[in-house]
A protein has these predicted regions:
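Structured mid-to-C-terminal alpha-helical surface segments
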Residues: 1-164
Length: 164
């Protein structure tokens, strides 16, 4: 029927799902958890090392503190599910399935962080990032991470000024 094809740049699946997991933990919206459900239900995806690596990078550059995203208390999705999700997808997914996905993500993702991931995140918030712990040579140049480090430096200075 159509004789035209196009090529468009897209995110690598590790970047896509790494960022989706940050969004799912942060916003706790059914749309994000639907995508995480897809990741878990696709045999070649799941919490693959490259996906968790990308998650750590997106988490490192997120505007909220790392611990607030990674260990956020779960919120009810019932209202957003009814008002903003039902009818959005071709495949019907019930709220219970999305809540089970949320539970699984909260349980499994912290356990999937390697010692290198944990050490990198700690070094970042300590304002002494050890870039060698992550597989991306360009990480120190990402604007979101540079912004995060600038804000952490300002916070450290404010704290020191109040203290003494």
């Amino acid at each position: 029927m159509f004789n035209t094809s196009i090529t468009v740049p897209t995110l690598h699946e590790a970047e896509l799902y790494g960022s989706k997991m940050v969004a799912a933990l942060d916003r706790q919206h059914p749309r994000d958890l639907f995508d995480v459900l897809h990741m878990y239900s696709t045999p070649t995806l799941g919490l693959r090392r490259d996906i968790v690596d990308a998650f750590v990078c997106y988490l490192a550059g997120h505007n909220r503190p790392i611990h607030e995203v990674l260990f956020a208390p779960k919120h009810s999705m019932a209202g957003a599910y009814e008002k903003e999700f039902v009818g959005l997808t071709i495949e019907a997914v019930d709220l219970t399935t999305l809540e089970a996905t949320q539970d699984k993500l909260h349980r499994e993702l912290p356990a999937a962080l390697t010692p290198e991931h944990r050490e990198f995140l700690f070094s970042l918030v300590s304002l002494e990032p050890d870039w060698s712990l992550m597989p991306y040579g360009y990480l120190s140049e990402l604007p979101a991470i540079r912004w995060k480090l600038q804000n952490l430096e300002k916070l450290k200075k404010k704290s020191a000024d109040r203290c003494c």
